[in-house]
């Protein structure tokens, strides 16, 4: 699975990149702002994205999420305060709250990979809060 990471805290982005690669997936790019994320969406066409809500250019992650949804790319918010996510999760599959454990992220990534691959039979891990209408179109 090709994964895009949208996160303005470089250390967290690098840790997540490492976790994604150790799980056998390819990171198509790291974006720290909404403009970088838009470039990545157009340049690499990821299969999935992790998106922080607050980026270098402000609370623009929700807008990035909506652009991903419009492009048909499933995503999950990664945020320190998931209560700031709009009702319906702005089209996201769900959210992972920071701080997260590497084991929690690994379990979420395994579940997400199955969902993106078309297998919706599994149960979500505790680390992943699903949107009520979460499904991949």
Feature annotation, model-predicted:
Residues 98:
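A Lys-centered signature of the CheY-like receiver
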Residues 51-69:
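Conserved phosphotransfer microenvironments
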Residues 116-137:
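CheY-like receiver
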Residues 78-79:
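Hydrophobic/aromatic residues positioned on beta-strands within the core alpha/beta folds
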Residues 30-48:
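Acidic, metal-coordinating helix/loop segments flanking the phosphotransfer/catalytic sites
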Residues 101:
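Receiver (REC) domain switch/active-site region of two-component response regulators
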Residues 10-29:
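Two-component/phosphorelay signaling modules centered on CheY-like receiver
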Residues 7:
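Conserved acidic carboxylate
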